[in-house]
């Protein structure tokens, strides 16, 4: 799978791509990321990419010409592309969209803005706008890396163990279950006995139950289209939680 990133900070992108799961996937040829320095597509000796906004106002706006030149250049190879603008106005990125992108045959090209944004005429060059959340960042580089990382880890061979990505949070509609490793006990906190039992069926049920518990407590909005078995587990959890609340309410208070 091929990604492209248009940015004024190519070293920012390239540094991240050297490490971790994404770095290994690139070394194995599972994915490819081409980074383009927007300043290479300017026409003045100062390699200027921004200017004052028409109508006044604070900050600077990125000019359309460098983006236009860069996009025309990369399109000259004739490959099919989906050009994506990273923008707080875009569609919210999530795990479902990451999975959809893994099936995309086109090159995914990410446009990274800076300053107060990009000249509105950039919209005539893009296919889609994507946001990673309702907050303000200094530029589109972090969102581009978030999306690339999220997609790459879903590609066959990227994680080594194919079950790893299947069991990630959100892949089955829930948050993840708790994870433990050695030592069995740390400062009085023990690993749940069920995980040491070797009974894989019971462990799977425990993990499903704990994933539902975490989702119910932290992201109840994700609890949709539950199976009958999940509904049964959820009802048991609700009874358990309500019982705990009542017990806590009746505990004596020491003044």
Swiss-Prot record:
**GO CC terms of this entry:** cytosol
- Look up keyword Transcription regulation and say if it applies: no
Q: Does the keyword S-adenosyl-L-methionine apply?
A: yes
Q: Which InterPro entries match?
A: Alpha/beta_knot_MTases (IPR029028), tRNA_m1G_MeTrfase_C_sf (IPR023148), tRNA_m1G_MeTrfase_TrmD (IPR002649), tRNA_m1G_MTases_N (IPR029026), tRNA_MeTrfase_TRMD/TRM10 (IPR016009)
EC number(s) on record? 2.1.1.228
What is catalyzed by this enzyme?
A: guanosine(37) in tRNA + S-adenosyl-L-methionine = N(1)-methylguanosine(37) in tRNA + S-adenosyl-L-homocysteine + H(+)
Entry's Gene Ontology molecular function annotations = tRNA (guanine(37)-N1)-methyltransferase activity
Keywords linked to the UniProt accession:
Cytoplasm, Methyltransferase, S-adenosyl-L-methionine, Transferase, tRNA processing
Disulfide bond residue pairs: none
Recorded hits in PANTHER family, A to Z, give: TRNA (GUANINE-N(1)-)-METHYLTRANSFERASE
Q: What does this protein do?
A: Specifically methylates guanosine-37 in various tRNAs.
Family, according to the entry, reads as follows: Belongs to the RNA methyltransferase TrmD family.
**What is said about its interaction partners and assembly?**
Homodimer.
Q: What is this protein called?
A: tRNA (guanine-N(1)-)-methyltransferase
Supply the source organism for this entry.
Thermodesulfovibrio yellowstonii (strain ATCC 51303 / DSM 11347 / YP87)
Q: What is the lineage of its organism?
A: Bacteria, Pseudomonadati, Nitrospirota, Thermodesulfovibrionia, Thermodesulfovibrionales
